[in-house]
From Swiss-Prot:
One of its GO terms (biological process) is lipid A biosynthetic process. It holds the Pfam family FabA. This is 3-hydroxyacyl-[acyl-carrier-protein] dehydratase FabZ. PANTHER family: 3-HYDROXYACYL-[ACYL-CARRIER-PROTEIN] DEHYDRATASE. Involved in unsaturated fatty acids biosynthesis. Catalyzes the dehydration of short chain beta-hydroxyacyl-ACPs and long chain saturated and unsaturated beta-hydroxyacyl-ACPs. It is found in: Cytoplasm.
Length: 140
């Protein structure tokens, strides 16, 4: 398990863009983390005031940050950054609303030099909310 302090040590993101609250499981190539979605999220002010829904792009960002925690926690990547290089086969299956807990899983399936490919999914109450294949570049 990695708490919020460990997450902040790995990631450069801060409020309001830090979208990982806790890491539940971590192994060499897979990480499972959570994001507790509350009505206090700043994006709910405009998306949508009468029907708040977490923007899909922010779900994907939360998945990317989850993968980033795994990659940037490795000694050889300390102090580096992870940048999006692409997204593929992204699907949104369930709306994420205030009160939901996103359970995010990212598994690295390919690495070549500074490029990494991750299969990622976000679930709410055991149901798939979003999934996709994310490509990252690791840099200084």
């Amino acid at each position: 398990m990695i708490d919020i302090q460990g997450i902040k040590e790995a990631l450069p993101h801060r409020y309001p863009m830090l979208l990982v609250d806790r890491v539940l499981e971590v192994s060499e190539d897979t990480i499972v983390a959570i994001k507790n979605v509350t009505i206090n999220e700043p994006f709910f002010n405009g998306h949508f005031p009468q029907y708040p829904v977490m923007p899909g792009v922010l779900i994907m960002e939360a998945l990317a940050q989850t993968a980033g925690v795994l990659e940037l926690s490795k000694p050889e990547n300390k102090g580096k950054l992870v940048f999006y290089a692409g997204m593929d086969k992204v699907k949104f299956k369930k709306q994420v609303v205030p009160g939901d807990q996103l359970v995010m899983t990212a598994t690295f399936v390919k690495r070549r030099g500074t490029i990494a490919v991750v299969e990622a999914k976000a679930e709410v109450d055991g149901k798939l909310a979003a999934s996709g294949i994310l490509t990252f570049a690791i840099g200084n």
